[in-house]
Amino acid sequence: MLLIPAIDLKDGQCVRLKQGDMDQATVFSEDPAAMARHWVEQGARRLHLVDLNGAFVGKPRNEAAIKSIIAEVGDEIPVQLGGGIRDLNTIERWLDDGLSYVIIGTAAVKNPGFLKDACSAFGGHIIVGLDAKDGKVATDGWSKLTGHEVADLARKYEDYGVEAIIYTDIGRDGMLQGINIDATVKLAQSMSIPVIASGGLSNLADIDNLCAVEGEGVEGVICGRAIYSGDLNFADAQARADKLRDGQ
């Protein structure tokens, strides 16, 4: 089970939101690169970056902070980024700058042809982010709810060559209420693309529950507010996941 610390960027700072609300941002660090280094020292094997400003305006907005993170740890572990990535030039630029994966969210929903082109041009580097509330996909920084069912949309991407799908339960994001295991497993079982869970991770019990369904196609989890608030120690969580993987 891949545990992936999240670094959400707003106005150049590392923040956490509640349920995607930009007005409910808690600043955890004014030095994102130092935060990235901290998570690597705690045993992180990948980092998940979100350009929050970019997600709302549709183009990159926290370039300096993102590049500082890549410079700090990009040679050691893979770094993935979502938020404001809606054209091929932006993808190419970020990959050239040292990102390992780019996450396409809104653009994948609104323009499947773009996603197909991105997978064709940058195979192995494209992850889709599907954010949902009550099973329905949301776009534009979670500000707009569509009529698309998550599983129906995800299955359409199977032939594209998508590396993984990050499934976020918006209602649980930042609320420390636990991962929506049932919905995550249901999505993973409905298709062949690996799923990364997101939204609500709160304690070691969540890690146990996720590891129990790893064989169903759930390959990782985004670690957000819990590892910043102290509710979950990241190093302990990674150690627990490794023990469960090894059957200990």
UniProtKB/Swiss-Prot annotation:
Keyword Amino-acid biosynthesis on entry: yes
Gene Ontology MF annotations: 1-(5-phosphoribosyl)-5-[(5-phosphoribosylamino)methylideneamino]imidazole-4-carboxamide isomerase activity
Catalytic residue positions: 8 (proton acceptor), 131 (proton donor)
Signal peptide limits: none
Protein location: Cytoplasm
Catalytic reaction(s) noted: 1-(5-phospho-beta-D-ribosyl)-5-[(5-phospho-beta-D-ribosylamino)methylideneamino]imidazole-4-carboxamide = 5-[(5-phospho-1-deoxy-D-ribulos-1-ylimino)methylamino]-1-(5-phospho-beta-D-ribosyl)imidazole-4-carboxamide
Highest taxon of source: Bacteria
Listed HAMAP family: HisA (MF_01014)
Family classification: Belongs to the HisA/HisF family.
NCBIfam families, per database record: 1-(5-phosphoribosyl)-5-[(5-phosphoribosylamino)methylideneamino]imidazole-4-carboxamide isomerase, PRK13585.1
Protein name (database record): 1-(5-phosphoribosyl)-5-[(5-phosphoribosylamino)methylideneamino] imidazole-4-carboxamide isomerase
